[in-house]
């Protein structure tokens, strides 16, 4: 009989072990056996909680997406300035939060993006994440710009966030958060300046 209250603990152990395994050997070589060993559990526990490796990857991505959402939400809740600029900066900062730019998270995101092209459940997660980012950016830009300019600015800033993140992930070095923030801030300020132009 399973111990009461163990499910959340086991799931968390396995998600963190997945992040560690992907960081160490990549998604392709992150076997169920390796993940179980890193989590200190038997292989069968993964099947019990997640069915298979794809289920575990989906749960791991939901964990990262939840951390991303929390990082953005906390920054926006702490704002004293309700301007579109302040909200846009908070969204950018949340996307470059340490929970998203540490080595294990970055490698897992890269594996997720590649796998999402072939797995419908992961593709749905990716689409939801893309839509959420675009929608939040567009709403804030729309507070100050025309609808067409707001949509274009939101697409541009979303692409810039993803591009800065991807280039940072592929360097193999520690992510330069300050540089990424400064580039993104400069872009959003240029877009917001169109109101008076």
Swiss-Prot record:
GO terms for biological process: glycine betaine biosynthetic process from choline; negative regulation of DNA-templated transcription; regulation of DNA-templated transcription. It comes from the Bacteria. Keywords: DNA-binding, Repressor, Transcription, Transcription regulation. Gene3D superfamilies: Tetracycline Repressor, domain 2 (1.10.357.10). The keyword Transferase does not apply. Coiled coil: none annotated. Pathway: Amine and polyamine biosynthesis; betaine biosynthesis via choline pathway [regulation]. Residues 31-50 bind DNA. One of its GO terms (molecular function) is DNA-binding transcription factor activity. Residues 8-68 form the HTH tetR-type domain. It holds the Pfam family TetR_N. PROSITE patterns: HTH_TETR_1, HTH_TETR_2. Repressor involved in the biosynthesis of the osmoprotectant glycine betaine. It represses transcription of the choline transporter BetT and the genes of BetAB involved in the synthesis of glycine betaine. HAMAP family: HTH_type_BetI. This is HTH-type transcriptional regulator BetI. The gene is betI.
């Amino acid at each position: 009989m399973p111990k009461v209250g163990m499910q959340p603990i086991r799931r968390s152990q396995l998600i963190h072990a997945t992040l560690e395994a992907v960081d160490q050997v990549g998604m392709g070589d992150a076997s169920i056996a390796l993940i179980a060993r890193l989590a200190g559990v038997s292989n069968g526990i993964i099947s019990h909680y997640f069915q298979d490796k794809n289920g575990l990857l989906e749960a791991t991505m939901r964990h990262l997406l939840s951390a991303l959402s929390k990082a953005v939400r906390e920054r926006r809740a702490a704002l004293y300035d309700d301007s579109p600029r302040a909200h846009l900066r908070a969204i950018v900062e949340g996307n470059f939060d340490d929970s998203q730019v540490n080595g294990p998270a970055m490698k897992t995101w890269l594996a997720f993006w590649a796998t999402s092209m072939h797995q419908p459940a992961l593709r749905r997660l990716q689409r939801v994440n893309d839509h959420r980012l675009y929608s939040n950016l567009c709403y804030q830009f729309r507070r100050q710009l025309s609808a067409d300019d707001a949509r274009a600015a939101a697409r541009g800033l979303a692409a810039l966030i993803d591009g800065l993140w991807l280039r940072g992930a592929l360097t193999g070095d520690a992510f330069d958060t300050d540089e990424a923030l400064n580039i993104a801030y400069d872009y959003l300020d240029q877009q917001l300046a169109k109101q008076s132009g």
